[in-house]
Structure formats: structure tokens, C-alpha cells
């Protein structure tokens, strides 16, 4: 659990902002949303597999688009 020490004379809003940032870094809210409802093991595997496929397709798309960038043009034929 993230903790934040409030300094003497510090604005409570700044302390709250630091606490929210530390919670975000720790991933508490995402974990809470994930555990809000029970997910069957098969559904969890299916979701993870779909996420892996999506990451893979995104990586392939990035690789293909970077190859089409400047400097990778076809040479003109001089015939």
C-alpha cells in the first residue's frame, strides 16, 4: 500500500496528488478493476491470448511501417 507523508504546512491537495500518483505506479486501480468480478480460468486464458495476438499484430504493423520509411525507396531503373 503506498504511503505519503504530509509535510508540515504542505497543501493537502499536493499530498493527495502524490498519493494518487504512487497508487497509479503501484497499479492498484487496474488490479482492483480486474478483480472486481470473478473471471473463469478459461475466460482469463482467452483474454490473455487475445491480448498477446493484439500485441503481436501491433508489433508487426510497426515493423512494416518502419520499413516503408524514408531511405527505403526503390531505385529508379536507368534503362
Swiss-Prot record:
<dbReference type="InterPro" id="IPR018278">
    <property type="entry name" value="Ribosomal_bS21_CS"/>
</dbReference>
<feature type="region of interest" description="Disordered">
    <location>
        <begin position="47"/>
        <end position="79"/>
    </location>
</feature>
<dbReference type="InterPro" id="IPR001911">
    <property type="entry name" value="Ribosomal_bS21"/>
</dbReference>
<protein>
    <recommendedName>
        <fullName>Small ribosomal subunit protein bS21</fullName>
    </recommendedName>
</protein>
<dbReference type="GO" id="GO:0006412">
    <property type="term" value="P:translation"/>
</dbReference>
<dbReference type="GO" id="GO:1990904">
    <property type="term" value="C:ribonucleoprotein complex"/>
</dbReference>
<feature type="compositionally biased region" description="Basic residues">
    <location>
        <begin position="47"/>
        <end position="59"/>
    </location>
</feature>
<keyword id="KW-0689">Ribosomal protein</keyword>
<keyword id="KW-0687">Ribonucleoprotein</keyword>
<feature type="compositionally biased region" description="Basic residues">
    <location>
        <begin position="69"/>
        <end position="79"/>
    </location>
</feature>
<dbReference type="Pfam" id="PF01165">
    <property type="entry name" value="Ribosomal_S21"/>
</dbReference>
<dbReference type="GO" id="GO:0005840">
    <property type="term" value="C:ribosome"/>
</dbReference>
<dbReference type="GO" id="GO:0003735">
    <property type="term" value="F:structural constituent of ribosome"/>
</dbReference>
<comment type="similarity">
    <text>Belongs to the bacterial ribosomal protein bS21 family.</text>
</comment>
<dbReference type="InterPro" id="IPR038380">
    <property type="entry name" value="Ribosomal_bS21_sf"/>
</dbReference>
Amino acid at each position: 500500500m503506498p504511503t505519503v507523508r504530509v509535510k508540515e504546512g504542505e497543501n493537502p491537495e499536493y499530498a493527495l496528488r502524490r498519493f494518487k500518483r504512487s497508487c497509479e505506479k503501484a497499479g492498484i486501480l487496474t488490479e482492483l478493476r480486474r478483480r472486481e468480478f470473478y473471471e473463469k480460468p478459461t475466460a482469463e486464458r482467452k483474454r490473455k491470448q487475445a491480448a498477446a495476438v493484439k500485441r503481436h499484430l501491433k508489433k508487426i504493423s510497426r515493423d512494416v511501417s518502419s520499413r516503408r520509411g524514408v531511405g527505403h525507396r526503390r531505385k529508379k531503373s536507368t534503362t
